[in-house]
């Protein structure tokens, strides 16, 4: 299908031939009528969405639907403002213009247990835990008894069974 610009269509408009102008006028009237009908249907359905047909007469004598009284309070529908103040004491701007927030974290007794914490970390550094590899890929919880002590299992050794001929019934 050929595509034309708006200017080309306006240039061709004078040369265009409409064989039956009364048919074209009737078609345009029908299109306008359908547009009006569609707008009226939209308004009707829009009003039905918000009301069940109940109305009342207000103090000025106007008939109004009840739906405006069923709205939620304005304080519950909007976003709440952020009332926290942003502190500017920990912002450090470097020579490139980047601003970094360097705020020390607050902790209770941070200086009190530094040497105890370092001593504990040194003592725990050498402890190795053997994981239970059969459950690593699953979401199933690991049994703590398997991680603590590996259970001894009696296994069948084929080489011992073949190499030892004394147990057979050769008597």
Curated annotation (Swiss-Prot):
Alphabetically ordered keywords of this record: Cytoplasm, Initiation factor, Phosphoprotein, Protein biosynthesis, Protein synthesis inhibitor, Translation regulation
A Pfam cross-reference name: CAF20
Keyword flag Phosphoprotein: yes
GO terms, molecular function: eukaryotic initiation factor 4E binding; translation initiation factor activity
Transmembrane segments: none
Localization: Cytoplasm
Compositional bias annotation for Basic and acidic residues: 86-95, 115-129
Keyword Cytoplasm: yes
GO biological process: negative regulation of translation
GO CC term (a single one): cytoplasm
Disordered as annotated region, ranges: 49-144
Family as reported in the entry's similarity comment: Belongs to the CAF20 family.
Function, as annotated: Acts as an inhibitor of cap-dependent translation. Competes with eIF4G1 and EAP1 for binding to eIF4E and interferes with the formation of the eIF4F complex, inhibiting translation and stabilizing mRNA.
Protein's name according to its UniProt entry: Cap-associated protein CAF20
Originating organism: Debaryomyces hansenii (strain ATCC 36239 / CBS 767 / BCRC 21394 / JCM 1990 / NBRC 0083 / IGC 2968) (Yeast)
Gene assigned in the entry: CAF20
């Amino acid at each position: 299908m050929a595509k034309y610009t708006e200017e080309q269509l306006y240039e061709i408009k004078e040369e265009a031939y409409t064989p039956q102008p009364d048919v074209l006028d009737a078609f345009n009237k029908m299109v306008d009528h359908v547009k009006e009908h569609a707008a009226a249907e939209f308004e009707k359905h829009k009003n039905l969405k918000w009301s069940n047909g109940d109305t009342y007469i207000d103090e000025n004598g106007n008939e109004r639907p009840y739906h405006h009284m069923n709205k939620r309070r304005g304080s519950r529908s909007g976003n709440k403002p952020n009332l926290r103040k942003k502190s500017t004491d920990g912002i450090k701007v470097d020579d490139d213009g980047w601003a970094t927030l360097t705020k020390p974290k607050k902790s209770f007794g941070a200086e009190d247990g530094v040497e105890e914490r370092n001593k504990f970390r040194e003592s725990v550094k050498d402890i190795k835990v053997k994981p239970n590899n059969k459950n690593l890929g699953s979401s199933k919880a690991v049994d703590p008894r398997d991680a603590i002590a590996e259970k001894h299992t009696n296994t069948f050794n084929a080489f011992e069974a073949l190499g030892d001929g004394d147990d057979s019934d050769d008597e």
